[in-house]
Design a protein with these regions (language model features):
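N-terminal interaction/assembly modules
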Residues: 1-83, 100
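Short, charged amphipathic recognition helices of the HTH superfamily
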Residues: 41-43, 109-118
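Short, well-structured alpha-helical segments
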Residues: 56, 60-63, 90-93, 97, ...
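Short, flexible active-site-proximal loops enriched in glycine and acidic residues
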Residues: 86-93, 105-114, 127-132
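Contiguous, well-ordered alpha-helical segments that form the cores/surfaces of helical PPI scaffolds
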Residues: 93-104, 119
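Inter-helical turn/loop segments and adjacent helix faces that build the functional surface
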Residues: 120-128
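Conserved small/polar residues in nucleotide/adenosyl-binding loops
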Residues: 134-139
Length: 141
C-alpha cells in the first residue's frame, strides 16, 4: 500500500463485532426481549453463555441497568418519541433503552454509546428506523 494511501474503510452495512462490543450488546438485546416476553432474567441470561466472561458481564450489567432504570429511561424516550414503535419495530425500543442506559447511567462514552446503538439497530434489522433517527436528528439542527 502506498505511503499516502488511506487504510481501507470498513463496510458500514455490516457492523463489525470484533472490538466494538456488538456481541455483548446483541446478547443484551435478546435477553431484554426474552424478559419482556415473560422469561425470568436468570433463564434469559443463558443467551449470553457463549460470550467471553468480560462480554457476558457487560451484557448482564446493560440488561440490569435497563431493567432497574426502566422508568427513568422510558421517561427520557417519551420526550423524544411521539409514540412508541409498533409492529415489528416494537423490539427496537429495547435497543433505544440500551442506548439511553449507556448514555445516562453507565460509564460508556457518548460516542461509543451512540455508535453501538446505531450499529445494533442495523444488526437487529432496523435499518429504516436508523435512517429515521438520523433524519429527525438532522432536522432538529
Amino acid at each position: 500500500m502506498p505511503q499516502n494511501a488511506a487504510p481501507p474503510r470498513p463496510d458500514k452495512r455490516k457492523p463489525q463485532a470484533a472490538g466494538t462490543g456488538l456481541k455483548s450488546r446483541l446478547a443484551a438485546y435478546e435477553i431484554l426481549k426474552l424478559v419482556a416476553s415473560g422469561r425470568y432474567l436468570d433463564e434469559a441470561m443463558r443467551k449470553a453463555s457463549g460470550l467471553e466472561p468480560r462480554d457476558r458481564a457487560f451484557a448482564r450489567m446493560l440488561v440490569t441497568t435497563c431493567l432497574r432504570r426502566g422508568g427513568q429511561i422510558d421517561a427520557v424516550l417519551g420526550v423524544a418519541m411521539s409514540k412508541p414503535p409498533a409492529g415489528r419495530a416494537r423490539d427496537a425500543i429495547h435497543v433505544m433503552r440500551m442506548g439511553v442506559a449507556q448514555l445516562l447511567f453507565m460509564d460508556t462514552g457518548a460516542h461509543a454509546a451512540v455508535d453501538s446503538t446505531v450499529s445494533l439497530m442495523r444488526a437487529a434489522g432496523f435499518e429504516r428506523m436508523t435512517c429515521l433517527l438520523y433524519t429527525s436528528d438532522a432536522a432538529d439542527d
